[in-house]
Amino acid sequence: MITMPHLKSGKNVKLLFVAVLALTILTTLLLTTDPRCALTSQTADTIITPTGSFDNYRLSMNRNGNWRHLSPTQTASLSRLGRVLYLDEDPPAARNRTFLILVWKYGYTTHDRHMKQYSDKEVDPFARCAVKNCVVTYEDAAAARADMVILHLHRTENVEDMPPVRRPEQIWAFSTDESPTHTFLNGQHNFNAYNGLFNWSMHYRMDSDIPVPYGRTVAKRRIDNDRSFDFSAWLTNRSNTSPIAVMGSNCGSQNHRWEYVAELRKWIDVDFYGGCGTLECPGHFTKDCPKLAAYRFYLAFENSNCDEYITEKLWWNAYAKDAIPIVMGGAPSRRNYAQLLPPHSYINVDDFASPRDLAFYLHYLLDAPDRLAEYFQWRRYFEVRNEHGYFQTPSYHYCRACEALNYNDLTTKKTYTDLLGHWSEQTHCAAGWDMVQGD
């Protein structure tokens, strides 16, 4: 509260009036000459009541996965493994047998990631797994014996690239870590040619038969009151120059993310690392970029806006570095992020009319430490896990495949007769940011 001094004379009143008038004129000049201070009414509303307030989630937090607020349709689309991962259901008992998993033809291309985690030694892919009754092989000669064949769509050249033999009870699972925009590495394919081939899907979405997201949010079994986040230390250790970092090596994208960054930089400082920027730092899968830990915010901008497509850019470059992620990607964006990330742990570009309005909100947070600290309250209730295998983090791909063989229904034969209905750019992706419409 501001208290006014006691005024004893008319002279003091005049002096106070002059001072207030001068301050008003100076403030007006600043607001009209510095574009970073040209606060719009819409931005002001955003600042007063920011979306995704943590308080809105307190009463709905529980330990059974309902905090995601999945729709009945979404819940029905989950496999048994999906219900374990996303609804926190107890898994069934492991089956009393050993399964052989063949990674067809291109297993070696991801060996360093899933079997070494980009380290200098082999790791057991089932070391952290709830089940261990599986064997993984790259030997294509095992195609006739394998219980499951994993087929990497990204590397597949055409439909003739499939195994030549197949047992009736064998499960073929198509696998991809890319969005539908970049499903195939070798140009466009006729998706209809693959109809009727695959029994299971293996990708990052919740509705996959074998969900393999880049990371996951897990509700803690009990509220963590003992280890609160040291916000004061965090604030002290962050960069006092540029508050935001971004890193990119793929300089092309269909969602115009780099155009958005260019516009954002007109209103707030952003340090740009990687081949698309001017600053150098390792950090492309194999080597980490420790410099990112010096920033308050990280632009976790994906290369396409597709359903649930949230990569290591967010899980590792932001959350693992204790930076607040500013997100662009998943579509429909607000629902995707709200169901997959801790509440009030991120800032969504779709909540702002333009990069300028986003910048104003970030300036506001930088000047309001109490509001900035609210973006870390989720840590008492949730934890985030990196599960992608980059930067020597655990890879759960083969573990999830083994869990699916143990948990999912093996008695009912499932077949994807319409692959495009499950996986297509037209159905599962959205248009990117438009500079004309977005500002």
Where in this protein do the model-derived segments appear?
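Catalytic toxin/effector domains delivered as secreted proteins or via bacterial secretion systems
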Residues: E178-T181
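Pol beta-like nucleotidyltransferase catalytic core
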Residues: P5-I150, R155-F174, L185, H189-W315, ...
